[in-house]
């Protein structure tokens, strides 16, 4: 599908709609609310030195081979199941591990793939409800003159309600900070969704949220529904997400 990116703020509802050529010069925020980007942000807030988003289990193990034993934590999922031998992919469960000062290599079905897909942009950030205000503050300060593209990871080629909602949260904050005069229709739609319902309510009733509750992960969903409670701004540089310190 051809997506026009001639607006100041645009939203893609699926990672598959990314156009690698049109990424050049743009600022990209990648979202996977349940749970990839929420987990990576939480890990960095909990003291991890960095997070390396991997495409899959094999890619993660390949990356881990370059680290000293004990300095790295492998975590992730495939089709929502924890990869055998890896730490769990959800925020609270991963934070139960000793992450302080260690590198986290993290592989997921959608979110980490989207981050890798977006790597050709001028600036790439991992965003979630958890750090929305911090990311927008940073972008407004450093990249206000660029086109901002919010990428929803989605699920297996389909849009996810929680990612669309998260995109709306970012659009709302960007509009309040930089103005709402040049939003794409997709950005307006995401903003309307965000304004329609509280975060926890929507995340608990969406398809992925219900699936996670059936797996006993209701508290993880509630954790990911908290808005702007973390100051971590993870920027992707050379395949690594490290926290960008707010000035």
Q: Predicted regions span which residues?
A:
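N- or domain-start disorder-to-order transition segments that initiate the globular core
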Residues: 1-12
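Structural motif
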Residues: 9-10, 26-29, 49-52, 70-74, ...
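Short acidic, Gly/Ser-rich segments with clustered Asp/Glu that frequently serve as metal-coordination loops
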Residues: 16-20, 28-42
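A short glycine/serine-rich beta->alpha loop
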Residues: 26-27, 153-159
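Short active-site loop/helix that positions an aromatic residue
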Residues: 39-46, 63-64
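Acidic/Gly/His-enriched mid-domain segments of enzyme catalytic cores or analogous surface patches
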Residues: 52-145
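Long, charged alpha-helical interface segments
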Residues: 85-123, 137, 161-247
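Glycine-rich anion-binding loop/nest that anchors nucleotide
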Residues: 149-155, 178
């Amino acid at each position: 599908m051809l997506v026009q990116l001639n607006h100041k703020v645009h939203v893609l509802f699926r990672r598959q709609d990314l156009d690698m050529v049109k990424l050049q010069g743009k600022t990209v925020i990648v979202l996977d609310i349940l749970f990839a980007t929420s987990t990576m942000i939480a890990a960095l807030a909990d003291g991890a030195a960095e997070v390396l988003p991997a495409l899959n289990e094999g890619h993660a193990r390949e990356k881990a081979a370059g680290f000293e034993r004990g300095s790295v934590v492998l975590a992730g999922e495939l089709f929502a199941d924890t990869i055998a031998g890896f730490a769990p992919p959800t925020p609270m469960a991963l934070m139960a591990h000793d992450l302080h000062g260690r590198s986290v290599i993290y592989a997921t079905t959608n979110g980490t793939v989207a981050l890798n897909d977006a790597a050709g942009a001028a600036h790439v950030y991992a965003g979630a409800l958890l750090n929305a205000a911090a990311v927008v503050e940073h972008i407004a300060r450093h990249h206000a003159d660029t086109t901002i593209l919010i990428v929803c990871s989605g699920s297996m080629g389909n849009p996810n309600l929680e990612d669309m909602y998260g995109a709306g949260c970012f659009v709302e904050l960007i509009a309040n900070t930089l103005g709402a005069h040049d939003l794409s229709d997709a950005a307006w739609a995401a903003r309307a969704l965000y304004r329609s319902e509280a975060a926890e309510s929507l995340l608990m009733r969406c398809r992925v949220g219900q699936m996670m509750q059936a797996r006993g992960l209701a508290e993880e969903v509630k954790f990911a529904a908290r808005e702007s409670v973390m100051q971590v701004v993870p920027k992707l540089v050379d395949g690594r997400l490290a926290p960008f310190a707010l000035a």
